[in-house]
Amino acid sequence: MLKKFDKKDEESGGGSNPLQHLEKSAVLQEARVFNETPINPRKCAHILTKILYLINQGEHLGTTEATEAFFAMTKLFQSNDPTLRRMCYLTIKEMSCIAEDVIIVTSSLTKDMTGKEDNYRGPAVRALCQITDSTMLQAVERYMKQAIVDKVPSVSSSALVSSLHLLKCSFDVVKRWVNEAQEAASSDNIMVQYHALGLLYHVRKNDRLAVSKMISKFTRHGLKSPFAYCMMIRVASKQLEEEDGSRDSPLFDFIESCLRNKHEMVVYEAASAIVNLPGCSAKELAPAVSVLQLFCSSPKAALRYAAVRTLNKVAMKHPSAVTACNLDLENLVTDSNRSIATLAITTLLKTGSESSIDRLMKQISSFMSEISDEFKVVVVQAISALCQKYPRKHAVLMNFLFTMLREEGGFEYKRAIVDCIISIIEENSESKETGLSHLCEFIEDCEFTVLATRILHLLGQEGPKTNNPSKYIRFIYNRVVLEHEEVRAGAVSALAKFGAQNEEMLPSILVLLKRCVMDDDNEVRDRATFYLNVLEQKQKALNAGYILNGLTVSIPGLEKALQQYTLEPSEKPFDLKSVPLATTPMTEQRPESTSTAAVKQPEKVAATRQEIFQEQLAAVPEFQGLGPLFKSSPEPVALTESETEYVIRCTKHTFSDHLVFQFDCTNTLNDQTLENVTVQMEPTEAYEVLSYVPVRSLPYNQPGTCYTLVALPKEDPTAVACTFSCVMKFTVKDCDPNTGEIDEEGYEDEYVLEDLEVTVADHIQKVMKVNFEAAWDEVGDEFEKEETFTLSTIKTLEEAVGNIVKFLGMHPCERSDKVPENKNTHTLLLAGVFRGGHDILVRSRLLLLDTVTMQVTARSSEELPVDIILASVG
């Protein structure tokens, strides 16, 4: 009799698993029973179960002991007990990678595979293929072909699925079984047809034409298996994406025709495929949306869930296409399945009108406590999208978010809410104080370090700009008193930012920082001491440079440069300008934390794209004296069409006095090899080409890189914009495409490329200034210049802002790239660093009448960057 456990034991798992406390040595000792005569099937099957359990629990079996157990197990083939035989097949598959000489069972498996007992044949095929390698496969090829076309569906399916696994190691052999697979694909059995279709596709998937023919054949003659239809829909949609085909394609017609299939599975798969096709218009989505609308009223919960989840996805890009389903979605809000109700609500939030928000919020709040954190995050994301769509509703949405914030929940859920509140604060200045107050209350009882430090950073950034900044000090200082060291350090930094921006509060802040100097933690003490000394100087420039804006360099780059400096001692002081600049704000230069516990950081920080380029260029002897790399263009520029015989892409690398053009070349002609490849450049301005670094050899389809080194203008340093004409020159040597043999003699040839533009943006690296006003004061007005321009071809402020940001290649600060609605004036604030490490700031005041008038004020620590900005705009 089995012992009856109560519910508590069941839930805890205590005592409910009879195999829980197995010992490997004892089980292997028991395996000697396999050698006894007569065989006891029940006892042997139980021992095999124990062995399988140990393996699946991760227990390590040594090669010798596994081999001994495996050889003993082979004697069990003498028994005809069906249960024991099936257990043998399972054990063979599990131990095939552990034991040695497993091929000893090949003859036994082949015998079962070709025998009369259908229950043995399918599992025997699977086990045989598991132990067969590429060298043995040809010996059983005949049996596999027979099994694929076998009349017994389980045998045929086993052979087809096993063939699919064998493709990875023996593609050429399995490819010869295509005729048998095609015969199996016409089977009446739904699983056989599905598996056969899968094998055919994977054999042909690298041949686009063969895949197209296969789709055409099976869509024309029809399929019996709904699984096969689903497979064909996925293949067709993938083919459509790769071909970037129009919606007039037969493939799209096939997918659309599946919306009328009698199987619900196929109908949903077709609707899902259409919805996920890139660039689908609302008109093309309409049939799929209609089908999903019908599924919303299905009695099957799975169908309702699938429909509403897919509609939710459609609503992100095409909310108007889902509006017709609003009535059905509203009916699902009261669905007994909370997952369906949540998705229905979030979909309605994306498609509903402003007037329906209050009602929807009430409905959501009625069951928020009953759904999982995963779905709560979905709700928060929908509310975030709603905030951007209807900014006037921020008060209602903010209150709802704060109510959610006070409830129990995991890290991801709370982070989603905090992200949403912060985005509302940034998008809507009216909601700033309300949002900050809610966040202050949250950190009073916040168990997540990452969120607490992030909110403290936000308070230090936004709090001093509010009408009553002193009210936040109590919340921040409470963190110094009550929290652990990471949060205390964040609180000290936040306090310092209040002192740096508010002279009235400075004495109080200094008192608080003096208390922090005695903290137990080094980091907290060091921060407090540093900020205290800076603030006591009462200099705006120091406050801006060391407290409000801080470093604009790459943290991994700084770490690497400092390590290099300590390894190679020098009399010269460490030059911060030798460190690559940060392309993201400092707070984002860390891995995303996904738990509340301290996450172990990787020992080595992954190199950035610019650091990789720096190392590659430093390895070229011609570039040794160029100094540190200032900037690399974010995206390579294509100088040829993608379908031409040579594919050339250029990346521009900017140094303090030079430009290096990196040309990544690919030869797409299989009957030619190119040698000594260079790209000759002719500038239109005062640039001077200094040298070329060729690609010595460029065989077929093997990328190579050549470089051109150019000196920047010296006579007129403001003339940084330039157009280069480019010609690729090389020696052609013919080669045999089959053998790869190259002719000894070649001939000179050239290939004209597209012109290459160098703009002012190539000389400026964008940097983020959290506090633009402080940075503006820090740079000073010694080299300030101002000019007014008319943008005659631009008709909107949004277009003007976008063009200016793109043209200058600078970072918009304080969200000034967002133009408020119904305004005819706007101020754009831009920050960057000019090559050589000189800060450059631009304040652009825009006025919209008939055209846009722009007043540009530029400041820098040197005169040249200011002159270049104004000259380039003019």
From Swiss-Prot:
Entry membrane topology: Peripheral membrane protein
Key word Transmembrane present: no
Location of region: Disordered: 1-21
Bilayer-spanning residue ranges: none
Region described as Interaction with ZNF289/ARFGAP2: 609-874
An annotated GO cellular component: COPI vesicle coat
Top-rank lineage group of the source organism: Eukaryota
GO MF entry, a single one: structural molecule activity
Major localization class: cytoplasm
GO annotation, biological process: endoplasmic reticulum to Golgi vesicle-mediated transport; establishment of Golgi localization; intra-Golgi vesicle-mediated transport; intracellular protein transport; organelle transport along microtubule; protein secretion
Residues annotated as signal peptide: none
Phosphothreonine modifications at: T594
Location(s) in or outside the cell: Cytoplasm, Cytosol; Golgi apparatus membrane; Cytoplasmic vesicle, COPI-coated vesicle membrane
Protein transport listed as a keyword: yes
Biased amino acid composition, Basic and acidic residues: 1-11
Alphabetized InterPro entries for the sequence: ARM-like, ARM-type_fold, Clathrin/coatomer_adapt-like_N, Clathrin_app_Ig-like_sf, Coatomer/calthrin_app_sub_C, Coatomer_g_Cpla, Coatomer_gsu, Coatomer_gsu_app_Ig-like_dom
Keywords, alphabetical: Cytoplasm, Cytoplasmic vesicle, ER-Golgi transport, Golgi apparatus, Membrane, Phosphoprotein, Protein transport, Repeat, Transport
Main function: The coatomer is a cytosolic protein complex that binds to dilysine motifs and reversibly associates with Golgi non-clathrin-coated vesicles, which further mediate biosynthetic protein transport from the ER, via the Golgi up to the trans Golgi network. Coatomer complex is required for budding from Golgi membranes, and is essential for the retrograde Golgi-to-ER transport of dilysine-tagged proteins.
Family: Belongs to the COPG family.
Subunit structure: Oligomeric complex that consists of at least the alpha, beta, beta', gamma, delta, epsilon and zeta subunits. Interacts with ZNF289/ARFGAP2 through its C-terminal appendage domain. Interacts with EGFR upon EGF treatment; interaction is essential for regulation of EGF-dependent nuclear transport of EGFR by retrograde trafficking from the Golgi to the ER. The coatomer interacts with KDEL receptors; the interaction is important for retrograde trafficking of KDEL-bearing proteins from the Golgi to the endoplasmic reticulum. Interacts with COPB1. Interacts with TMED10 (via C-terminus).
Record's protein name: Coatomer subunit gamma-1
